[in-house]
Amino acid sequence: SWTEFRNSTLHYINLAQEHFFKNNQHEFNTSFTMATRLIAFHQLGCRLLKHEMVKKNLRREARRLLKKLITSMARIGVNSNLFFCSPQRISLINQLAASRQSDPRDSKVSITSTNTTIPDPSRSSASTIPSFLNQESPARPIRNFSSSTTDTLMFSEDWQSNSPNLESPQEIPSTRTSVPSLNAPLSFSVIDDESGILVQSLFQVIDTEFFRFKKNVVKLHDLMQAHFGQGDLPQLFPRFFKGHFNEGAWTNPFHQGYEYGSAQNSDSSPVFDSSQQQANDSLGNRSYSVPSKDHTSFRGFSVSSKATSTASSSNAKHSITGKPSHTRTFSRAKIMKRNRYPLNGDTLNLLKKKFNFIIINYYGNDHRLIDQPKSKKRNLELSADTYKALNYIVDMIEVLENLDLTFFVNLRNMSHDEKLDRESEELRKHAMTSLASTLMEFFEIKQALHDIAIRQIMDVQGLTLDDPFVFCAIRDESVCYFDREDELSKYQFLKQEKFAEELRNLLISQDVEYNDLAFLDADQLVREAFAKFSDIGNTMLQNVEQLIEERENILNYAARMMKSDLTAALMKGEQEKWFEDEDFDMASSAEGNENLDFGDAQNKSFSRDIPWYLDSEHEYSLIYDNKGNIKGGTKEALLEHLTSHQSIDLSFNLAMLLTFRSIFTTGEFLQALVERYNLYPPEGVSYEEYNIWVEKKQKPVKIRVVNIMKTLFSQYWTPSYYEPGLDYMIGFAQLAKSQKISGADVLLSAIKGRLSMKGNLKNFVPESINFSDDGSSTTTVPQSSRSSVSAPVGSSSTTGFRMRKLKLLDIDSLDYAKQLTIKEHSLFYKISPFECLDRTWGNKYCNMGGSKNITEFISNSNHLTNYVSFMIVKQTDIKKRIQLIQFFINVAAHCHELNNFSSLTAIISALYSSPIYRLKRTWAAVPEEYKKLLEELNTLMDSAKNFIRYRQLLKSIGDFPCVPFFGVYLSDLTFTANGNPDFLHRNTVLVNFGKRVRILEILKEISVYQRSHYKLKRYEDIQAFIESSLENLPSIEKQYAQSLRNEPRTEVSTGLNSTNVNYRYNTKNGPENRNTGKRLKFGKAKKQSANLLSQ
């Protein structure tokens, strides 16, 4: 912060002043050098905040204070060198020491906030000043040191308030009557002739400038502290820093405050705000970071970093002069849009293609060239190949920098989601734990590619050097000095000889030949650089592949656990579409179609030859797709089509009645239907035309309105739709009945029954909806009695075993699969469309009454998964584990035969869960035919491309009984509702009705499989066994701990060590990867970790 900056600067300047009074040139130079560095950082900090300072009109004041600081710093530096080099001072050292010993007042000091005891220059008496400085001269009035000021320097903000106005040297509170100006040149003749007077003047100037220096430091601090909020400094050290970094060519999606698709707050801290970005751009700052494991927060999954910079020294020079470097380049870069590469197999293949091209076409040839005798031709060819390969390396880095890691960012951000259920939170924590090292390694690989690209250029350039140490930097800031106070009294050497001896010793300490160092072998460095790049490239491909697999595994596991909300949250913001079929992408198709397609002409009123007064008023406000189905329209047009007098659109009616609550409120919808019932004739019709209008439009519309209301209240009503003030609907039904509208009496009875319940969901039993294409959407069996429909043909209470002796392996795998199927189908049959809508919308539009049956169905499947994994992992005997694995694979195969895809998915998820799949010794003993069968079943239920294999199989089942995997429907509903806009063409006028139609299609498909029933025999003892076994199961974390006890983890240590290169290259097949792998979470291979920072 600026406060810490101020304290550090005053600390070092006080130390410098203390050593100045003590005549300690060495310590003075050290402290004063640190103070000058801090002043340079003050200037850099103001430079980085220049945009904000211009907005706040602070730039002129800051420049004035900085100019004063630099002036004081220069005066102190020049005059202190003259002072310490003065022969008069050297000859009077002993006199100064004697004066200090004889006068006890020398101990009068002021205590500063740095806890350092130093002489207070504003309170110094005559005895504390060397006698040679106390000489009087008529030519130059001397300060009267007998009287002192009462001002004391303080670090706190009270310094400025307690000090008088000190804007000019004349106003300094002291008895100084004259101070020599530095504007007049000081010649050596003056030093020789008037040495005493000059030394006294130098002391006074330095004393004054120290005072001014401190005053201006505090003023600059107060200025910045008052106008920049928390007082945070901008980023001054692009080479080394802690925390998050996302600048220049380095991208870090885990950067603090970074969100996809949103801009940062302009009022944020100067460290991260937009002005900081502009300042960095103007400085030509191209900094890259490497995450540090010491600064990684696993709670939030935030990747912190320490960065190493590749910014050149020329860019730093630009920052000092205030002129932006590469202005034109960065102004173009700001408007350049980066493409995000999805985390999938296509991106991995692209990286492999680029990497193999580099190895085969460039580095393969370079390995042959480097073994040839040294020559200019060889070096030139090596340099040419390296610079050509650099273009492809940059392309690889570009892909890595823009790799879409939104999935893992979402996983991190979900830690604060209070809506996350316990199982989802356990899955998230488990995934975060196993992913942390992989993501850290990804950032290390990125930095390693940056480093190796630069290293290759430097090493190839070194081939042309006669002296390979020409680019080696000598240690900076080395000061050659000797303390003349004591040394001259001991040794009778001339000053020049002593200085030369110190310089010689310094150069010898830095000479390579005197430090037992070997000269570099440039050819060997090039070989190591090529091999290092190959190792980094191989590790990079493995790491990206593992990230892809981890993402797919988590999605697959979440989908199989039927966590649709979790899946949607994880995929939020990703570019990849969930639905491959373009029919599902309603948002893009609707918004991208500016030329409206009105579909089949014979179904549209405006394409027929009908009288104008019978035409539909809002027909032109509807949008149709290529199949003639309504895709969108205004609310008025949709209601007109719902009660059309010309034709009945059954599919449209079903979709509207089922999803109307997402378009209207209940009161709006019913009031619009009442207004539609009270239709008025158009103006300008004749008597004959009016009679025709009544017969062909008004009466049909009234009948349609009554039928729609009747269907709504009898089949599609839920107490969640109730709103106060709907009692007028009873009067409307009575009016329709008095007008002898068909179905009005049934409507009146339905309205009275539904409104009497008001909003009471406790005793409400939804009716089953028949989604038939013939329009006979009639009420079937109430949900309360639906369980009896799925009852088996026969039942038995025993299977030949007594229940108290019944064990899992005593049950035949086919019988176990059948009983699981009966149980799953019974739970599946109870699910109603309103529960599906509740899962889809939540409380967005209204409280749909919850989804108890869906929750029970999902819990049963997840408990089955936990039970399967627990039964295997709790066995300490490897033979029993193998036996149980074979049993459950057989059960899964039988579930497949029975079309019970719910239990099939649950068992596969258990066998591929981390506690089970990591048991290498156990799986090695499982027969190959079982592993092959399991792999086939896993491929069938793979979530790749939105369960495309499973969907294809499901379509071929037809009317056979089936228990579908309900997670697919939940995902379809979630992504249809959340992945498509409610309105088309980016406005709130055209309702996206195609989105509602898609929801109806999903609910129709669910209802198809609910109508098909199994004819299986129910065994009560097995059912009771299954019920009891699915209770009180340990969590996945406890099971994983038990798995580690059964088969402890084997440590594998390998990496990219530049000193031991394990690289083999095949010119035909490309680089060979000799790294072995190990299995991690969800059964996927995890590559061996590598320490890429070892150089």
UniProtKB/Swiss-Prot annotation:
It is a single-pass membrane protein. Its main location: membrane. It is found in: Membrane. Residues 626-756 form the N-terminal Ras-GEF domain. Residues 309-319, 776-798 have a biased composition (Low complexity). GO terms for cellular component: plasma membrane. GO terms for biological process: cell division; Ras protein signal transduction. The keyword Cell cycle applies. Residues 103-133, 158-178, 263-295, 309-333, 773-798, 1044-1078 are annotated as: Disordered. The keyword rRNA-binding does not apply. It holds the Pfam family RasGEF_N. Residues 109-133, 263-290, 1044-1074 have a biased composition (Polar residues). The chain crosses the membrane at residues 959-980. One of its GO terms (molecular function) is guanyl-nucleotide exchange factor activity. Residues 812-1049 form the Ras-GEF domain. Keywords: Cell cycle, Cell division, Guanine-nucleotide releasing factor, Membrane, Mitosis, Transmembrane, Transmembrane helix. SMART domains: RasGEF, RasGEFN. SUPFAM superfamilies: Ras GEF (SSF48366). Promotes the exchange of Ras-bound GDP by GTP. This protein positively controls the level of cellular cAMP at start, the stage at which the yeast cell division cycle is triggered. This is Cell division control protein 25. It comes from Lachancea kluyveri (Yeast).
